[in-house]
Each structure stands twice: as structure tokens, then as C-alpha cells.
Amino acid sequence: MSGNTIGKLFCVTSFGESHGPAIGCIVDGCPPGLVLSAMDIQLELDRRKPGTSRHVTQRHEGDRVEILSGVFDNITTGTPIALLIRNEDQRSKDYSKIMDVFRPGHADYTYWQKYGIRDYRGGGRSSARETAVRVAAGAIAKKWLHERYGIVIRGYMAQLGPIAIPFKNWEVINQNPFFVADDDYVPKLEAFMDALRKSGDSAGARINVIAEGVPVGWGEPVYDRLDADIAYAMMSINAAKGVEIGAGFNSVTQKGTEHSDEITPEGFLSNNAGGILGGISSSQPITVSVAIKPTSSIRLGRRSIDKAGNPVIVETHGRHDPCVGIRATPIVEAMLAIVLMDHALRHRGQNEDVVCTTPKVPGNIINPTNPVTTQPDVRRAEDPEPDENS
């Protein structure tokens, strides 16, 4: 199997299956000198790990990360960083009834047709379990980006099934099990999920993520555009079925006078472009929205076929997320961080010495209530100033 690596200079290669002994990744290209401990990574993993509420899978994995190489005395050495997370709570017998059938909407059928063999236990390589190591790698990228450039990457759930959740403030996002930015909606979401779980069905979600503080100039046209690489990374996430950047599909109904973001010496007047123009970052906040499909493994009977091609009814019993989108926010943040760090290193390698006499337009801070409007650029007191010499 190929296609297990993302990135050109900051490269992440993942390995492992849902019910194997462990999952892990190799992070290659991280510069030396970054202060990094297992706790830096664990903090992000704990946001994603299963079994944290009744609304997600009850598979209880500690997701304790082990740093096997690339770090000495809590400082990155510039050599490959090997990260390992051991699987501790597999229950493979739950999948014995589907070993010879294909779950509708799942990768079972296509993996079987492509490889002629598949690990049916928990979906094997196609399981969302693999995303834990993306979060681990993304934790490294998030820390490096923040320390070198002051970049802040934050996400939140904007919709769960039919329920759209407005943005209220960032502070409550990590204080509720849904990563929503308005905790007044939590009781409504809990009632929706309780009813969904009892029905045996599943639901989708929409995750928004914003990167603030990205300098102007990152991105490699034409085939390695920053927005193209972001979309590629997001669509590699299990269950992702759509990506929008900036105004996204709303651009279809806009006129040019509405969509094009006017520029003033004080900043941009809107952010329909989502912080990217011509595949290159504009210094505006990068805004991304990802659609997560409903979980394929559900208890309700669905028509399918077995390995012999015979019609069957498939019911999936086991510990599954009724909505994988509930735990997707840290994953989406991680993938954006990985792409941005890769492009930061690529830009530094070729264009660090470029001098442009035109003054740089301030990158206004996004207004999360409306992702295409902006606010004055006010850096948070705790954020470091960008280090142009790093």
C-alpha cells in the first residue's frame, strides 16, 4: 500500500491498524531545537481520544504516546521523530459477523477489490483509529508554528446533523464534549445524540478551523497551491466528504463585487478568499470548513453483498461513534498544522531572502461568527511576536 505519507519537507508517514498491536508515525523534517516532550503531544491526543463521553465510542484507549527517536533531552535533534501509540482495548470478536460481508458506505468493499485481502477487525487501516497519529504529528507542527510565527490554529463544530451551532466564543470549546463554541447548545446536542444512539443510526457534522497569524507568501503554485494542499489533507481524513475554503460554495451565488476582498492600507475589508489568493497565503486568517459523513457502522439492517456476491442484510454491532465528527475537531486542526508547517519550510528554503518594497497589508483577525468578515488585527498578549529569523 502506497499513499501513507503527506508533505514534502515536513513529512508524516503513518502506520498501523485499528486492532493491531499499535499505531504510529514517523515525522521527518522537523527542524532541530524545538523543545518537545511527550506531554506536548499528549495534550492534543487527550482532546481526541475515545471513551470521553457517552456520545462517542466506548472503546477505552489511553492513547499514551511514546517518543522513540528524534528527541534528546526534550529537544528535537532534526532526525526522524518516531511516535508510537499502543492499542489497548481491541475487541475483535465484535466484528466476526462482518468478516465475509461488506458494510454499506464503508471501505470494506473497495479494500477487498483492490487488495484481495482486508483486516475486517474495526476496519483495519481504513479505521478512524489511524487519525490519532495525525493528531500526534500535528501537535509538533502546531507548537513549531506558534513558537516561530505566533500562528494560532483553532477549530470548532459548526453543525451536528441538522443542528447548526452559532459561534459564541473560543473559551468554551474545550469545555464541552462536542467542541462547540456556544455551550448553550450542549443540552440540545446531547438530546439529539441520545435519541440517535437509541435509534441505532448515525449522523454527520461540519467542522470549521481557522489559522491566524500565517504570513503572506506561503504556497507553491500551481500544483502545490496552499489551498489545494489543505483540501488534499482534509479529504484524506476518514469520513471527510467535502471541503470549503473561505466563502466556498457560497461563491457561486456571489457577484464579483461581493466576492473579491477589497484591500486598504489598514487591511482587507472581507475574507471570502479564506486567507489564500492564487494558492498563496495573503496574511488573512485561513478559514476551512470540512463536512464529515455519518458513520457507516450502524445497528440498523442495510442491504449489501457477501464475498460470493450474494445479497445480505448487514447489521454492525460493536463500539462505534454515532457521529465521528464529534471527535474530528483536533484532527482537522492537526491536518491544517501539518500542511502549514510543510509550506513554511518550503517557503523558507526558496523565498526567505525575497525583498518586496510594497508594504505588507495587515492580516485582520477573523470574526468567527461570520468567517468572511474581519476584525482589527489585535494580537493576543500571550502570543509571541513572529520570529522572522527562525
UniProtKB/Swiss-Prot annotation:
GO cellular component entries? cytosol
Q: Does the keyword Lyase apply?
A: yes
Which InterPro entries does this one have?
Chorismate_synth, Chorismate_synth_AroC_sf, Chorismate_synthase_CS
List the catalytic activities from the record. Answer: 5-O-(1-carboxyvinyl)-3-phosphoshikimate = chorismate + phosphate
Region of interest (Disordered), ranges: 360-390
| A Pfam family assignment | Chorismate_synt
Tell me the GO molecular function terms: chorismate synthase activity; FMN binding
**Recorded coiled-coil stretches:** none
Keywords, A to Z?
Amino-acid biosynthesis, Aromatic amino acid biosynthesis, FAD, Flavoprotein, FMN, Lyase, NADP
Q: How is the cofactor bound?
A: Reduced FMN (FMNH(2)).
Q: In which pathway does it act?
A: Metabolic intermediate biosynthesis; chorismate biosynthesis; chorismate from D-erythrose 4-phosphate and phosphoenolpyruvate: step 7/7
State the source organism's domain of life. Answer: Bacteria
Binding residues for FMN? 125-127, 238-239, 278, 293-297, 319
* Polar residues: bias regions: 366-376
Positions with a binding annotation for NADP(+): 48, 54
Enzyme Commission number(s) of this protein? 4.2.3.5
Instruction: Give GO BP annotations, semicolon-separated.
Output: amino acid biosynthetic process; aromatic amino acid family biosynthetic process; chorismate biosynthetic process
Q: Which cofactor does it need?
A: FMNH2
Q: Which CDD domains match?
A: Chorismate_synthase (cd07304)
State the oligomer form and interacting partners: Homotetramer.
Q: What does this protein do?
A: This reaction introduces a second double bond into the aromatic ring system.
What family does the entry list? Belongs to the chorismate synthase family.
List the protein's name.
Chorismate synthase
Which gene underlies this protein? aroC
